[in-house]
């Protein structure tokens, strides 16, 4: 604080901010208060925003240099609004007692204070660069002032429109609050007396529209004294006149009383004609209410005229109105669709609830979650029920609804050809029988004379069509036979009359019974001399197949594929059985069926042999088969003819799929590519999840961990298998898996349908695997790549040879068997200690013979104490290779000398024998 009161002057003319400036201080310097009466002149560069002053107002004249403190009393009209304002002499004293950062400007003619330190000299001459900088700053300030003027004009227009809306709302509220107005009218005389001295007209708060103002007029209407607060309120640290303060306290008390039963603070009060108003004409500060100054920034508490915006007041008014009306909203119950998993945020949006409310409910239930957390459908259903909504559960599998297993009406069903599967043991003549029926020669084109693919054909008998499915009879093709039995209506069990019932015959019977299809027994090869059909019938009885000739219900026909005997009777039996079954299907619907076989053709791409079971398949339609989809490019029959459509029970080859489906997959026609892609992606994701679950289960299960620990020492034979069709690859993988033992097993690194490519060679090189091609070949680039890298490629067309070669190769990985052969025993008679040799045992051969270099065991009291090899074997002084029984010899062990008389030396030979699987 300073000790002198003469070095300051207070300027209250107009609405200028009170500042303190030393004498002689030029523009751009600021007096900084250092505390305890110390000051410091600081040269600064400031950017001032000059408010736009209306043209009709005159600029505020500076205070006369020699004027005393009382000279500041004459003020503009807004300041003279309160005649009871006392002399400002106490304000000077108060200003000396309360230090602030803003001091009144100091007149230049006054002498410097004695207590001030020497001020730094500020040069009045500026350099050209500084002048340019000031000019630029002045130009920027003028541009900003122009923008502020435009912005203020727009704000005034907006607030004028808001004022009209506000007054309309106030008029509505006035009708509901007539009782409170009567109370305020009764109190009006008491309030009007202290306000009568002020020159402000009472009509200032009438409903007449006011001119737009930069600052909100709502606070002015709420507190009349606040409108002129920046002008009437003394500077920080000055004394407030008692009369003004008392009147303001009374007014604030009045407002608080009205807030209890009327509008809350911050809201605009309705026009009240009977209530005296103490407002003053708007001053320059009110017009610049929207501009932030030091004075307005320091204003806080209830005197702040810019407490809230019109939007905030409207919100509070609306909130208060809702509270007065006490309207209860009716709860809207919605149907919430819940997938298998959903986030809390998504659930709240579907319920049209706040996520915070859902989080609060979960916290009450003891679960701390965030809006982004994922919950299952059960918990989501509980939450939705708690909030009063209904739930409809859906899952990802719903994308397949309406595609498979669609029921047909009885009126739409028509007769269809029967689907017949030929099953039986290998080499019992299944394919030959089908060739005889089709008048074709498929057997001659098969490698090894055995069927290794599943084939579908259609023949016509007496104007009726019959669809045949030929399955392999080899033991490796169990899955193919099972698929054939599932897709068929009638199963023909082919049994050779000279070979009778065999293992695959029994398996075929079980597949047919599991599929629930009727069986027709075809006893083949009856033209042979050793044929015995009755033996076949008797053996079938052991497996619960009772033929008609034995009192059963199963049809049996003796046929010969070679001579064509009784083939017509077999076809008649098939048609008779089909008539009994009354096979029907709906041809006027989207197609649905089963994939019989699939392969990757080099020229045609992915080719799938399908059996249409329902509907009609046409080119151009979009189908989904397993996890692949595509648009049908062409339909090819078993004879190679292109057809325009394929009805129920018709086997065709489909071209145009995006990939090679698995044999046995269901296919169906969908309406759009997007639907097909969605189903395909869902099935692929499901397959990945299952694979991941299997891997995680293997890692987590204790039993699996023990098995993995045991399998650490198992040797693996890595293979890359490429085949012509998916069924063959499946059969090869199953056959190789059965070859595995506890010591060695085949590991299939990769398998697929199609030719051998360079990527297969690269994979085999990385995994050190051999490549097996079944009925496929490697292209030129792949073959050259394999030769450079030394990768072995083996080609096979018969599954027997493939399995035998892999079995032999895996046998080479087995450790050889160690076999011991007993040679003889010798008893130690005496032990001699010979220099440079060590201990030598004098022995007599009591059984067999003793050979040098053979393995020996030293047995003492029937306990083996040492096992090793003979270091020397002598008879007398000569080294010998062997000593027969009954003779004496001298023996010494390698790295062992603890020999005693009476010990027995057992001599044996070790042989390593190669093992096979």
Curated annotation (Swiss-Prot):
Residues 449-453 are annotated as: G2. GTP binds at residues 424-431, 470-474, 524-527. Pfam families: EF-G_D2 (PF22042), GTP_EFTU (PF00009), GTP_EFTU_D2 (PF03144), IF-2 (PF11987), IF2_assoc (PF08364), IF2_N (PF04760). Gene3D superfamilies: P-loop containing nucleotide triphosphate hydrolases, Translation factors, Translation initiation factor IF- 2, domain 3. Residues 524-527 are annotated as: G4. GO terms for cellular component: cytosol. Residues 127-184, 246-258 have a biased composition (Basic and acidic residues). It comes from the Bacteria. Residues 63-113, 185-203, 215-244 have a biased composition (Low complexity). Residues 415-582 form the tr-type G domain. It is found in: Cytoplasm. Residues 424-431 are annotated as: G1. Keywords: Cytoplasm, GTP-binding, Initiation factor, Nucleotide-binding, Protein biosynthesis. GO terms for molecular function: GTP binding; GTPase activity; guanosine tetraphosphate binding; translation initiation factor activity. Residues 470-473 are annotated as: G3. Residues 560-562 are annotated as: G5. Residues 1-304 are annotated as: Disordered. One of the essential components for the initiation of protein synthesis. Protects formylmethionyl-tRNA from spontaneous hydrolysis and promotes its binding to the 30S ribosomal subunits. Also involved in the hydrolysis of GTP during the formation of the 70S ribosomal complex. Belongs to the TRAFAC class translation factor GTPase superfamily. Classic translation factor GTPase family. IF-2 subfamily. HAMAP family: IF_2_B (MF_00100_B). This is Translation initiation factor IF-2.
